[in-house]
Structures are given as C-alpha cells and as structure tokens.
Swiss-Prot record:
The protein's Enzyme Commission number: 2.3.1.74
Function: Polyketide synthase producing naringenin chalcone and slightly p-coumaryltriacetic acid lactone (CTAL). Can use p-coumaryl-CoA as substrate.
Top-level taxon: Eukaryota
Gene this chain is encoded by: PKS1
Coiled-coil blocks: none
Organism (species): Rubus idaeus (Raspberry)
Record's keyword terms, sorted: Acyltransferase, Transferase
Catalytic residues (UniProt): C164
Quaternary structure, from the entry: Homodimer.
Name of this protein: Polyketide synthase 1
One GO BP: polyketide biosynthetic process
C-alpha cells in the first residue's frame, strides 16, 4: 500500500523552478512620446485647454519614454468618441475591444516563447494568464487555450486586475506550480492593453494624466519548469524565492476602479517615496538567507513604474547607474506596460548578457532581484539565480 507521504514525494520536482523561454509582443501602432501631447489633445478635442496641455507636455518630456505601442489608433478613437471624453459611459466599447485583443496579443508572445522552448505545446501542463483589463467569462485564459490549440486538460489560472506588481505574482505562482508538480511546464502570459484606461484630460484629476503619459501596450510570455531536460531545454534563470508584502501607511497610494467610464486610475500618495523608503527591508528579508548585503552585486529587474521611482530607489540604495539600465531602457522603448514590464526586462537582460559576452544570463553576476510594485501598495520580490550564458 502506497502512503500519502510517498505520493507527495513522487509529485514534487527535485530542482528549482526555472525560466526556460521568453517571448514578447506589441501592437503594430507605435506612438512617439515627443509628439504625443499634440495628438492626445487633438484626438480628445481638448486643444483649448492650453495650460493643461503644457503640463501634459512637461509630464511626457520628464517621463524618460521615447515611444510606446498602443492598440488604440486614431481611426478606432474616432469611431468611439465616448472613449475620448474624461468621464463618458464607454465600458461596453472598451470591453468589446479588449476581450478579443488581449488573448490575441498574448498568443503572439506565447507563440514566440514556445518556439524558443522548442518543445511541443502538448507538453504544457499549466497556464497562468494575467491582465489588468478585459474581465470576461470564460476568461482570456480559456480564449488563449483555444487560440494556441493547447490540450483541453491544461490547468488554467486567470488573474484579472492585479496591476503593475503582477509580473512578480505570476513568477511566484509559476514557481509553486512547477516545483510541486513533477514534470510540469507552466506557460505564463501577461497581456496588457490600455484601451480600458484611455480617456480625455481633466483639470481637476492630474493623476489620470500621469497614467496617460506613462502607460503602453505589450504582452510577454515565459515557460517555467523544474529539472530542465539536459541538451533539450535551455535554462535562463532559476526562481529561488518569492515574497509579497503590503507597504505600511500606503492605503490608497495607487487605485484602479472599473466603472461605466472604463478603468479609472488614481495616484494619491508619494509612491516613489513609499517604495524607496521600504525597499531595503524587502531586500534584506529576501537575501539574508544568502548572506548578501551588497545590492550592487546583484543584477536588477525592477518594474519601471516611472522615472521618479527608479531615481529614488537608485539613490536610496546607492545603486550604480548600470544596475537599472535594462529597466530604464524598457521604460524608454515601451513605456509602462503594467504586469508585462518585468518579463520584457528579463528578456533584455538575458539578451544583452549574451551580446556583451557575459559568463551568465544575469550580466555576468550570479544573483539577481526582480521587483513588482503596484496597487495596495503591493510589492513582489523574486530572488533570481542566473545560469551560464550560451550563445
């Protein structure tokens, strides 16, 4: 007779969860940040608000973003004028777009990840899908399963409306799934489209304008599994530990509310200050078991909420400028893509590591940290271990 203990041991993987492939995708429509204020105030019929436009221009200039990708084109917005007002009922129009486009963009990223992984998609056992928008039943996880032609028995988990920290959350979940299910191969997809948050400007709600200056669209996918098959699967990063915490005194710092007008975005407190004040505590808790206290000895993947967050974290921890280079580069080239950002940065770090001839996937370093920041104020901290870089 087999015991429960024996069954449990047989179910568990031996090694740590490992990222085996990464894929990314964006909509084709690319928006230049320097000319975006002109376009935004024209399309929302707000050109008479000259002072507000000047404020928005300054926001865009200070954003450190060069360009963003957006599903919403001028043609789509002209067909849906209610989306261009500040608070017009428009949820139906927005939902009709995102319930179709979010799985579609996710499929593009997932297809790239599966191709890099090199294994048949029938070997995918679990699917974790994350998006801040497009709540529907059956969800984007179901739609993606159909679009990709995954097995109907794939075990799905759908995460809606978590916000910008969720790129860390999906790694935490994928780690637990891979390590507790021997042979599991988890497809993780973060797909974000700003069609639910786009709206016209308001003199009295500048926090909404901050969102209009920062957010972009993108999807990223990874394959996670333990005990990679030698000579068949190519490990990129090992997921060593994962933690989540709510920062003290941060209630209402970042809020998003789904209403008839779409998803409203509220920035109420000093978010960069709250994060920089508390980040060392998260680092100490994560790296104490490894006896690491030199934050410059790590490679960094931080959610780029905005330049002020990165500047204050850098200053508080005394980080060398190159530590957040990959993070700043993704912010510059894509804007803030919410949950997908950290996976884009992971992709950038491993590619640059190979291109620059580093010995490991983590810029030549052994250990790294991945941070997600978002509503709550919630912080996700993931400890990464790099592997030998292969060309």
């Amino acid at each position: 007779m087999v015991t429960v203990d024996e069954v449990r041991k047989a179910q568990r993987a031996e090694g740590p969860a490992t990222i085996l492939a990464i894929g990314t995708a964006t909509p084709p429509n690319c928006v230049d940040q320097s000319t975006y204020p002109d376009y935004y105030f024209r399309i929302t019929k707000s050109e008479h608000k000259t002072e507000l436009k000047e404020k928005f221009q300054r926001m865009c200039d200070k954003s450190m973003i060069k360009k963003r990708y957006m599903y919403l084109t001028e043609e789509i917005l002209k067909e849906n004028p209610s989306m261009c007002e500040y608070m017009a009922p428009s949820l139906d129009a927005r939902q009709d777009m995102v319930v179709v486009e979010i799985p579609k963009l996710g499929k593009e990223a997932a297809t790239k990840a599966i191709k890099e992984w090199g294994q048949p998609k029938s070997k995918i056992t679990h699917l974790v899908f994350c998006t801040t928008s497009g709540v529907d039943m059956p969800g984007a996880d179901y739609q993606l399963t159909k679009l990709l032609g995954l097995r109907p028995s794939v075990k799905r988990l759908m995460m809606y409306q978590q916000g910008c920290f969720a790129g860390g959350t999906v790694l935490r979940l994928a780690k637990d799934l891979a390590e507790n299910n021997k042979g599991a191969r988890v497809l993780v997809v973060c797909s974000e489209i700003t069609a639910v948050t786009f709206r016209g400007p308001s003199d009295t709600h500048l926090d909404s304008l901050v969102g209009q200056a920062l957010f972009g669209d993108g999807a990223a996918a990874i394959i996670v599994g333990s005990d990679p098959l030698p000579d068949i699967e190519r490990p990129l990063f090992e997921l060593v530990s994962a933690a989540q915490t709510i920062l003290p005194d941060s209630d209402g710092a970042i809020d998003g509310h789904l209403r008839e007008v779409g998803l409203t975005f509220h920035l109420l407190k000093d978010v960069p200050g709250l994060i920089s004040k508390n980040i060392e505590k998260s680092l100490n808790e994560a790296f104490k078991p490894l006896d690491i206290t030199d934050w410059n000895s790590l490679f960094w993947i931080a959610h780029p909420g905005g330049p002020a967050i990165l500047d204050q974290v850098e200053a508080k921890l005394g980080l060398k400028p190159e530590k957040l280079e990959a993070t700043r580069n993704i912010l510059s080239e894509y804007g803030n893509m919410s949950s997908a950002c950290v996976l884009f940065i992971l992709d950038e770090v491993r590619r640059k590591s190979v291109a620059n001839g580093h010995k490991t996937t983590g810029e030549g370093l052994e250990w790294g940290v991945l941070f997600g920041f978002g509503p709550g104020l919630t912080v996700e901290t993931v400890v990464l271990h790099s592997v030998a870089a292969s060309t």
